[in-house]
Each structure stands twice: as C-alpha cells, then as structure tokens.
Amino acid sequence: MTAVNDKISTIVNGKRVITKKPELLAPAGNLEKLKIAVHYGADAVFIGGQEYGLRSNADNFTIEEIAEGVEFAKKYGAKIYVTTNIFAHNENMDGLEDYLKALGDANVAGIIVADPLIIETCRRVAPNVEVHLSTQQSLSNWKAVQFWKEEGLDRVVLARETSALEIREMKEKVDIEIESFIHGAMCIAYSGRCVLSNHMTARDSNRGGCCQSCRWDYDLYQTDGANAVALYGEEDAPFAMSPKDLKLIESIPKMIEMGIDSLKIEGRMKSIHYVATVVSVYRKVIDAYCADPENFVIQKEWLEELDKCANRDTATAFFEGTPGYEEQMFGEHAKKTTYDFVGLVLNYDEDTQMVTLQQRNFFKKGDEVEFFGPEIENFTHTIETIWDEDGNELDAARHPLQIVKFKLDKKIYPSNMMRKGK
C-alpha cells in the first residue's frame, strides 16, 4: 500500500485529490519530437542544443529552433529545458558565454548542467535561467543534495541508481526540486560516467559521443596462458553488458506521494512514436492517480501500450533496492516491439471522411492498422483503398514520407498516429 502524504493533497467533496501534481518531463531530439511531446501531454521537454550536450548523434536544435520550441511550448503552458551537461575541457570554454546568453534570450526555462564552470557561467550571464544539476553528478544522498542547494541550484536530477528510501529522505531533509527518471535506458556506468566509448571508438561519451558500447554483443573468455575457454558466447548467444530498460509505471503512485517534483522520461534519440506513446501513457497514469488516489488501479491497457514501443525487456532497476540477476540483460536480446509506426496524420476532412497521412513505414491495402492520439480512444481499421496526392490509386504506401490518402469513417486529428502489428 502506498504511504499517504497529506502535504500534497486536499479533500474535495469528501474525496482525497492530489494538489501537487508532478511535472511530466519528456525528451525531444528535434523540433518535431518537441511538438509531439507537448501535444501528447508533456508538461516540460528537455532538448539539446548543437553544443555542450551529451547526445551529439541526436538531430539537436539551433538557437532559432530552440526559440521556436519555447514559443510553441508556451502556448500549451509547457517549459523547455536545454542540456548543457558535458564535462568541459579547456577547448570547450570558447563561446560558452555567448551560447548561454543566447539560451537566456530564447527564454528557455532552465539548463541541465554537470560542470561547475557551466553552472557559474550561466548564473553570471543568464541569471533568469534556472540551473538544474544533471544526473551526471551522480547524486544519491541528501547531504550532496543539500550542498548543491546551498550553491544556489534550482533543481537536482538524481542518479538512476538512487532508491525510493533515499529519495524520500532527500525530500524530507532538503527543500529543493527533485527530478527522477521513470522510463528509458539504463547505463552500465554510474549515471553515465563511462569511457568505454572513448576507448573503443575514440568518441568521448562525456562530451556527447557515447556509442552505447555496452549494448554491443560480446563473448566472454577466460585465458590461461595460450588457452582460452569460452565462458559465455560462441555456442551460447552473445551477451550485452547493459541492463534492462527502466519502467516505473507501477511506482508512480509512490513517487507522487513522496513529493517528487519532476518525473523524467529518457530518450532524446527515440522516434516520435516512442515519445507519443510513452508520454501519453504516463500522462494518463499521473492524471488518474491525482484525481482519485484511493481508487487508483494500473490499467492493463497502459502496460500493453508501453509494450507497443518497447524493443528491450524492462525492470524497476534501483528504485525498489539493489537489482538482482533478473534485472540484467544477458544472453539473447528479447526484442519486444510488437507494432511498427507507419504514419502521421496531417489532416482529416469530415465531409469526405478522407485522411491525409505522411507515411513513416510500409503499409498496404488490406492491412489492419491502429490509430491513437490524445483526442481519441485507440481503434483499429482495415485499409481498403490508398491514393497518392494526385488521386492515383496505390496498392501500398512504399516511399518514406510519402503523402497518401484513404477513407476513414471515424474522426481523427492532426498529429494522431497510425501503427500496425508485426
């Protein structure tokens, strides 16, 4: 049973409701993903600029795109945070002040920082921008949280390795905003402090170049002089060093009652289908619990929905304590994705019942597809006829980003998505 926190709730018409609803924080690797995240229910979005972030392989944002994203988010009451969480070397100092000033001028709500140099510089040149301490600082005790509060930071992003008991003590002893991960990839290294990528590919993982070496397939040998004995691999399936992905959907009630301020989804390099699916599910969970915590139950369809965009097994990692063997991913990878994202709705004409769709994966006549979006309940439909933009009939939508049309007798909306089972 979840412990009740009276500081975050009130009684309305004889029923307890949560008044301190946590922020739902979503990832976005480009402007399209940012807009999708906000449209599907994110309260805030974290993005990376083209410098000083840890995901150089994401599309990332120009200053102009950041400003556009901020203006878009503002219309929906959402915030934008920018990652500037590299561990800076001397050559990274050139241009830092100008970059942080530009972020301030773009009216971003906050920056996510690991390096004290960047913290000090931001507070000096962009004083209106909140400073959030990155998970790269590996905070896992309340004294460290207290230290950074005294340094003037507005929020701390906890290490993924922090347990529920440790987080509870932090909230009780330190008055500062706490952000905690709820969904996404885990790292074999402590909060991302890893140099495997540096050694294996000459890409600095702490300056945006991580190639996810821990997810490669490995064989393990024990050597004794000239002899090598395979301990794992060869006839067995190769193993990966990386743990299972994080999924804390069933722990959301506990996290809300603990007073955690921001619940964070990982995945700036993930697809818009991933962003839309995961954000929409956690939006429903948070809203449902806050509206009626006493009668809250995790719905089966929420769990099934998350599985539609997952390609790895999941676990609760460190939140409920030290993970055991079952939390790790050894042996053959379990590919769990059950659906392909095949199209983004651009328009729906109610008079003609015609859908205009941008193709994102192959589909054909006769396919059973599923539609989902924040304005609709999920439903399935069988594709009967497909036309191109010029009205020519097609047997399939074969080309990436091709604009196609087809009939649908249920109303849908722009930015709704279409997917099909594998």
UniProtKB/Swiss-Prot annotation:
Coiled coil: none annotated. The keyword Cell division does not apply. This is tRNA hydroxylation protein P1. Keywords: Hydrolase, Protease, tRNA processing. Belongs to the peptidase U32 family. It holds the Pfam family Peptidase_U32. GO terms for molecular function: peptidase activity. It comes from the Bacteria. Disruption phenotype: Deletion mutant lacking both trhP1 and trhP2 shows reduced 5-methoxyuridine (mo5U) formation in tRNAs. One of its GO terms (biological process) is tRNA modification. PANTHER family: PEPTIDASE U32 FAMILY, TRNA HYDROXYLATION PROTEIN P. Signal peptide: none annotated. InterPro entries: Peptidase_U32 (IPR001539), Peptidase_U32_C (IPR032525), RNA/ubiquinone_mod_enzymes (IPR051454). Its EC number is 3.4.-.-. Involved in prephenate-dependent formation of 5-hydroxyuridine (ho5U) modification at position 34 in tRNAs, the first step in 5-methoxyuridine (mo5U) biosynthesis. The lineage of its organism: Bacteria, Bacillati, Bacillota, Bacilli, Bacillales. It is an enzyme of class 3 (hydrolase). PROSITE patterns: PEPTIDASE_U32 (PS01276).
